[in-house]
């Protein structure tokens, strides 16, 4: 049975909004990651990160940053860094993906890695192998012509 999370505090809840990534923060909390606005790189867009406490079932906004990206397609948290997968261009133009790096302690956007290809990002996760953090991101074609999993070594260990 699925458990419904009350997301009524989100801007545009129930409409087309950019709140589309959930990842584990710690044993008690999940992070909900998304953007305000249309998801098409407007100057007023913001990245918002919310914490969802699994015990109290309470969703609270943690922080907000200026944002110059488009649709969020996935997120993962490891070693104090929040990695966010996005498309790199607006709707119906699929020419690649980005992985953004956010230092959550300092609430600061650190970096963006751009991957150019005829497709878009589809999810994001990590794995620690031999003490190194690797990011795994789905790379998919909107036309259904291909689907790959990309493996990227994190520069932020």
Where are these regions (language model features)?
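Structural motif
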Residues: 39-51, 91-101, 143-157
């Amino acid at each position: 049975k699925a458990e419904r999370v009350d997301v009524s505090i989100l801007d545009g809840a129930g409409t087309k909004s950019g709140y589309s990534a959930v990842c584990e923060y710690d044993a008690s909390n999940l992070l909900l990651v998304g953007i305000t606005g249309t998801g098409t790189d407007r100057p007023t867009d913001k990245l918002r990160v919310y914490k969802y406490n699994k015990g109290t079932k309470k969703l609270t906004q943690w922080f907000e940053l200026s944002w110059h990206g488009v649709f969020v397609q996935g997120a993962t948290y490891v070693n104090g860094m929040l990695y966010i997968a996005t498309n790199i261009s607006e709707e119906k133009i699929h020419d690649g993906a980005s992985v953004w790096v956010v230092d959550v302690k300092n609430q600061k956007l650190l970096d963006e890695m751009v991957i150019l290809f005829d497709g878009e990002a589809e999810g994001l996760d990590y794995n620690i192998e031999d003490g190194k953090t690797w990011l795994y991101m789905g790379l998919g074609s909107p036309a259904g012509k291909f689907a790959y999993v990309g493996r990227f070594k994190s520069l932020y260990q």
